[in-house]
Amino acid sequence: MTEPTPSRLERLALRMTALAERWLPDALPFALLGTLLVAGLALGLQGMAPAKALKSWGDGVWSLAPFSLQMAMVVIGGTVVATAPPVARWVDRLAGLPRTPRQATVLCAVASMTSSWFNWGFGLLFAAVLARALARRVAGLDYRTLAATTLLGLGTVWAQGLSGSAALQMATPGMLAPAIRTIAAGKGPGGAELVPGGIISLEHTIFLWQSLAAVAVEIVVVAALVAAITPLGPRARTAADLGIDLSEPSDDTHDRPHDGPRVPGQWLEHQGWLGRLIGALGLAAVLQQLWQAEHVAAAITLNTVNLTLLALGFWLHKTPARLARAFARATPATWGLLLQFPLYGGIAALITDSKLSERVADWLTAAATPLTYPPLVAAYSALLGVFVPSGGSKWVIEAPYVLAAAHRHRVHLGWMVAVYDLGEAVANLVQPFWMLPVLGLLGLRARDVMGVTWTVALVVAPLVLLLVTALGATLGYPL
């Protein structure tokens, strides 16, 4: 088959991908270097005493321990639900809908974005499972482009959805340091808090009509872009062309009654009623929280999201044995979070305790106006996200000065959380950190898909700057 001739934009993306893979280190060295850089700024620029800086860093290392566990559960829970047999069967039926390669890539892109809005962990794995099913069914489908579409939810709308880290942190008590809550609260006439407790519920972030409009625009634009760049005919390289085996491994998640366990303890592990009962209790607890909340949006926190995923995992996998195996398969994907989040906690503590956040807020205030502040933060968030590829931990670093400057510019604080999220997601299109779990499942390398994701980023980045500017102008202060 003739090798397809790439366009100028594709050639540029491939060159940039090769440079990034050759010269940029993994995410962990960035966290280590970031620790040293912030410590140096705290000591040199802010004049913080070395003993105080050391104590601040040491205390901050474990400040994100609850959040680290919650984010790990997002990854595990999303994976467990996406790989459950009933979901897998539904995915196979969905893969039977498209008839052409272009229809298949657009379907996968839309599925990735919409499912990632509900949960980024589920969306990432769900889209990957769908991509493999599509590649088996649709002839002449370019596997590289198809694989890249599985990442588009994480590169566009995920942070504007129900698992958006920054929005959930702002809405969940105890998920941010008290110093950050104080900054978010602000001070009004007479010293009263402008935002009580510094808590910003989801109705003021992801459920703003402006946020929902931004999500809808991104989905439409990206779907149209994917349709336009999908290689057809001789330009396409299928999974077979790339030497990738799409056959499914034997499914060992189903219990076989005829050779089931005999001892009582093992018998209990394979009883479907037990898992279904616990799953039902979990879903009932979530519904109770939603019913009792003053606003439904205010009740959707990391805890409720994770409880929902856990309950669905029990219900869909039925028996405790099946669920345990699903969790065991999903757990390795969380090691990066558990390793890096303590470092980010230490960085955040140094930034706030040294008043470095106030210095950066001064810079952002001086460099922007109320109209230009949102696009400035979106661009800065995207740039920093290339080097710190974690929306939640990066928000801990950015929140102090982003929110402080928002008060000074008198812009909507909830919208600035959404602005941060929209910018942060773009970074996932240009660096491979969050691509790794999916690429392993699809049998590809980062360089195989980043030409497509870079192409999407070139369109999405200016679109985001336009959206945050135009939609932000319709909102008042403080919420």
Predicted regions mapped to residue ranges:
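C-terminal transmembrane helix pair
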Residues: A133, R137-L154, A368-L479
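Hydrophobic alpha-helical transmembrane segments of multi-pass integral membrane proteins
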Residues: L97-L130, L338-S354, T365-A404
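Hydrophobic transmembrane alpha-helices of multi-pass small-molecule transporters
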Residues: M1-I76, I199, I206-G336, Q340, ...
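Flexible loop linkers connecting adjacent transmembrane helices
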Residues: L12-M16, K52-W57, A82-P98, V129-Y143, ...
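Helix-loop-helix module between adjacent transmembrane segments
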Residues: V74-A82, L107-G123, R144-G161, A214, ...
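Cytoplasmic juxtamembrane regions at transmembrane-helix boundaries
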Residues: P85-L107, P231-T253, L413
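Membrane-core helix-loop-helix motifs of multi-pass transport proteins
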Residues: L130-R237, M435-L467
